[in-house]
A protein has these predicted regions:
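Generic protein-terminus/edge-of-domain signal
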Residues: 1-52
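Short acidic-glycine-tyrosine-enriched beta hairpin
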Residues: 59-74
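Short, Lys/Arg-enriched, Trp-marked, Pro/Gly-tolerant hinge/linker segments that flank
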Residues: 125-186, 199-211
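Alpha-helical residues within the helix-turn-helix
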Residues: 184, 195, 199, 232-233, ...
Length: 267
């Protein structure tokens, strides 16, 4: 494992599946970056130390605040965008190890131990013994397996009719149409739509739309969009209603969230 500085998410990382290793790479970015959709044979864990990262795949959308990580399974088509200055890291896992983790993307809280292990692995010198690397790799992998999951992701449905519906919602999160209205627009009963939506996304329709709004709000806060503008962009009649929703989901107001996020980015 060697220290490297590459483009965000390392689209040009070594792409092979016959090497049994964990490759740790520290990323340092000082500007907004965006990568095109790409895939690689390694599983990838991406962590944010400062700033916010958004990751898009064919199956969904994840945001990664400071002190959080996102898991991207092998051969998953994905792209990423940072919101403001971003500093973070990646750990690449060989396919064999990746099979022991989730087969779909997930977000996790970064533990202090994981952060230190990544920095240690990324700063190894060329003469570090393989035995030392192997021992630390095992500890690093054990820590990854036991990371606490967070809910900073949103799955898209696979059914074309439902995908068209959610694509429409994501392009206009101010759309307040009810489940019944959406059901009529795609020719389903509301009961059938509710059942299929839950089966496809793991969430009820209202919860899915609320999470989409929260994730979008987090991105806009990172881009320094005023709270008033965010509220109206997301379809709320007034700022108070938006703040109440955000506090109910996140446990803090938007202003408190930004303060905490900035503090975590510094630490």
């Amino acid at each position: 494992m060697a220290k490297m500085k590459k483009s965000l998410l390392l689209a040009d990382i070594i792409d092979q599946s016959d090497v049994d290793l964990i490759l740790s790479v520290e990323l340092i970015e000082n500007q907004i970056r965006e990568t095109e959709l790409h895939r690689h044979a390694f599983g990838q864990l991406v962590g944010s130390l400062e700033g916010l990262l958004s990751v898009q795949t064919e199956s969904g959308w994840w945001v990664v605040p400071a002190t959080h990580t996102v898991w991207i399974p092998p051969n998953t088509l994905h792209g990423a965008k940072s919101h403001g200055p971003f500093r973070g890291w990646s750990v690449y896992l060989d396919p064999k190890r990746s099979q022991l983790l989730d087969s779909s993307p997930k977000t996790f809280q970064t533990t202090p131990l994981l952060k230190e292990l990544v920095h240690r692995a990324a700063s190894w010198s060329d003469d570090t013994s393989q035995a030392v690397k192997s021992r630390l790799s095992e500890v690093l992998f054990d820590e990854i397996v036991n990371l606490p999951e967070t809910l900073f992701g949103l799955l898209q449905p696979g059914l074309p009719s439902l995908k068209k519906m959610t694509d429409g919602l994501l392009s206009n999160l101010a759309d307040n149409r009810s489940l019944e209205e959406w059901a009529r627009s795609i020719g389903l009963s509301s009961r059938t739509l509710a059942r299929r939506f839950n089966e496809q996304t793991g969430l009820g329709f209202s919860e899915w739309r609320q999470r989409a709004r929260v994730l979008s709000a987090i991105e806009m806060l990172a881009d320094n969009v005023p709270v008033t503008n965010i509220a109206f962009t997301l379809g709320y009649e007034n700022v108070s209603a938006f703040i109440a929703m955000f506090r109910r989901v996140m446990g803090v107001t938007p202003g408190q969230y930004i303060q905490r996020h900035n503090k975590e980015s510094i630490s």
